[in-house]
Amino acid sequence: EMCIRDSGGIVSGIAAAAKLKNPRVKIIGVEPEGAASALAALKADHPVPLDEVATIADGTAVRQIGETTLEYIKQYVDEIITVSDYELMEAFLLLVEKHKLVAENSGILPLAGLKKLECRGKKVVAIVSGGNIDVLTISSMINKGLVLRGRIFTFSVNLPDKPGQLVAVSQMLADADANVIKLDHNQFKNLDRFHEVELQVTVETNGEEHIQHIID
């Protein structure tokens, strides 16, 4: 069983109830790398304030875990693991794309943590909870996740400053089955190259192999 780790209350409560029902169940808490206050407290054997908190999982962006919840964690939680913001974005995209569900960033910590465990042949429950997320954040998470997966790719190329170049590039991208999202044709960026312009292109792709095909 896997639980999120906020200020410690959720994982403490679930762990205590689960262990009461079945003492053999293993409880694993998951927290963001940029706010690993539970791990810091366990290493010091008492709550300690983090020097910095930086994570997209704002619901678990806790500088210091509570004393009471730390005692529950030490008693009932078998392990605490951490995940990166990159892994959180991957998990968010998986949840939306494959399972048609939306949860807040902190709520998908257990899903992101699954990749760090050997789950084959075991009964594992990843508790996904919390829907405190707005539409703009959802859009940002999806787009950034697509960029990380190579599904959205941006590149720049210098072109001769003469008519027909945009048509040639557009045709090349069409031949490579790349769907254009944005073209930025800037005549004034490379002032040291008077007869050239910079073209920045953003396209939809099918992944890394498709990107390599476009580059080649």
Residue ranges of predicted features:
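Short, small-residue-biased leader/transition segments that mark boundaries at the very start
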Residues: 2-4
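Short Gly/Thr/Asp-enriched flexible loops that form oxyanion-binding sites at enzyme active sites
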Residues: 11-22
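Short, acidic/small-residue loops that bind anionic groups at enzyme active sites
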Residues: 21-34
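Active-site-adjacent helical/loop segments in soluble small-molecule enzymes
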Residues: 66-122
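A conserved regulatory-domain signal marking ACT and ACT-like small-molecule sensing domains
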Residues: 137-216
